Regions:
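Acidic Gly/Asp/Thr-rich repetitive segments characteristic of extracellular carbohydrate-active
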Residues: 24-52
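Sec-dependent, cleavable N-terminal signal peptides
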Residues: 1-24, 434-435
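Sec-dependent signal peptide cleavage junction
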Residues: 15-27, 403-410
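Surface-exposed loop/turn motifs in large extracellular/passenger domains
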Residues: 63-73, 87-102, 110-132, 139-164, ...
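C-terminal low-complexity, Ser/Thr- and acidic/Pro-rich disordered "stalk" regions positioned immediately N-terminal
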Residues: 368, 375-407
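A cross-kingdom C-terminal cell-surface attachment/processing module
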Residues: 411-432
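Glycine-rich repeat segments that build the extracellular carbohydrate-interaction surface of secreted
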Residues: 41-57, 69-77, 158
Length: 435
């Protein structure tokens, strides 16, 4: 009996050790079922799942692991499907591989949805391809923040390709959600559609490119570096309470029906439009007045025109305080600023103490400089010309009389020299006559 009990105890201990051994090592998966199982079994200590083969998902997988910062290492493999793949409620990081969807439906979908306070990071070795087939009539985004998001975070260090990039649901009213782009979004449609409230940062090294680079309809957008680019032809915005309003512009600013206000800060980076597009387009398609829409351009390089539609023109939403432009943007200059013209480019500078350059308006110059108006209506700053008169110094005696100059006067010397030469000439001629 004792031997039997000892054997049972040994088996239990062996099973326990096996369980601990599994928990201490990352899970390896090779198909949809083992992926789902591994996600369900993940713990704070055992939080990494690694693919050993390509995985096809025919239905979405929920990631909802409280207290677990899940890491899915794609292992250089691909997770593919034809619709929503991941419904995310807790922190997850994808790295080292590809997530690929080809959609063939009529509704609008996202490959990955963030919910609540979910946090998603796409590392720099990840590609998310959110494509659609030729027969699809609905749009597909790679990542979306769902309408219940609060303190959700999306960080894009990798690359997004396909139909559209990332979006914030338009019904979100809390300014607690965060989108950070350090990587690349290169798509056919909208690279970023920021319909709802949140804070979005575009940083150095980022590339945000599509028919429309970014359309923001609520919240805050900070362009701190990188490139935001449009590849399309500009189309005037139209009212739309459930979708995008315009295309063909690198940066589209159009307040939503939710009337939550917009602040855009262009601090650095490049904003580029195609030849028939616009770099920046601001409008008020929902007739909200535009008083709470602010677009501040303090730096960067803007290639393409700035279009402020009549619907928002009275609100004067654009204020240029710095940056370089391919077009004349003097009508958008903030107070105290002026445009310096350098060939085919214009740079916004402070209109004070200007000592050189050509400008689109008359600049303010200090003493010793003048402004010359050119035939093309521009103004050039030049230094005022003058002459220098040399006044030799003398020593003054105590009786008030002046002594001889201390400094050699070249003018007087020349005069004396000429006089002596003339006298010598007369003497020489006179002597010759005497001979």
């Amino acid at each position: 009996m004792k031997k039997a009990l000892a054997t049972i105890l040994a088996l239990v201990m062996a099973i326990g050790l096996c369980s601990v051994s599994w928990a201490a090592n990352p899970a390896s998966v090779s198909n949809a079922e083992t992926l789902k199982t591994a996600i369900g079994a993940a713990t704070a200590e055992n939080n990494t799942i690694t693919l050993t083969d390509n995985v096809v998902l025919n239905e979405s997988v929920e990631i909802k692991k409280s207290g677990v910062n899940l890491v899915i290492d794609l292992g250089g493999k691909t997770i593919s499907g034809s619709s929503l793949l991941f419904d995310i409620y807790s922190p997850v990081t994808f790295k080292n591989g590809t997530i690929d969807v080809t959609y063939n439906g009529s509704a609008s979908i996202c490959v990955m949805w963030l919910n609540g306070g979910a946090k998603l990071a796409l590392e720099n070795d990840v590609i998310v391809n959110a494509a659609k087939s030729a027969g699809a009539t609905g749009s597909v985004f790679a990542v979306g923040l769902y309408n219940d998001c609060d303190e959700a975070e999306l960080t894009i260090n990798g690359k997004i390709t396909g139909d559209n990039g990332a979006t914030i649901n338009g019904t979100i009213t809390t300014n607690t959600n965060k989108v950070t782009v350090n990587g690349t979004i290169d798509v056919a449609g909208h690279a970023l559609y920021l319909a709802g409230n949140g804070i979005t940062d575009i940083n150095n090294g980022a590339c945000v490119k599509g028919d429309a680079g970014i359309e923001i309809r609520a919240g805050v957008l900070n362009i701190n570096g990188g490139t935001v680019e449009s590849t399309g032809t500009y189309s005037a915005p139209i009212a739309n309470g459930n979708g995008t309003t315009a295309s063909g512009a690198a940066l589209i600013v159009a307040e939503h029906t939710t009337n939550q206000g917009i602040t855009v800060n262009v601090n650095s980076g490049n904003i580029k439009a195609a030849s028939n597009g616009k770099a920046i387009a601001a409008s008020d398609p929902e007739n909200k007045g535009g008083d709470d829409v602010k677009l501040n351009v303090a730096g960067g390089n803007v290639v393409g025109g700035i279009q402020v539609e009549e619907s928002i023109e009275a609100a004067k939403p654009v204020a240029v305080t710095g940056g370089t432009f391919s077009t004349d943007v003097k009508e958008y200059l903030a107070e105290g600023k002026i445009l310096q013209k350098n060939g085919d480019t214009y740079t916004a500078v402070t209109n004070s103490g200007i000592t050189s350059g050509t400008y689109t308006a008359k600049p303010t110059v200090p003493d010793g400089y003048k402004v010359v108006e050119n035939t093309d209506g521009t103004f050039t700053v030049e230094k005022v010309g003058g002459y220098y008169y040399y006044q030799p110094t003398t020593d003054t005696k105590t009786d008030g009389t002046k002594g001889s100059p201390k400094t050699f006067d070249a003018g007087i010397a020349l005069y004396v020299g000429m006089a002596l030469t003339s006298a010598a000439g007369v003497a020489f001629v006179g002597k010759k006559r005497e001979d």
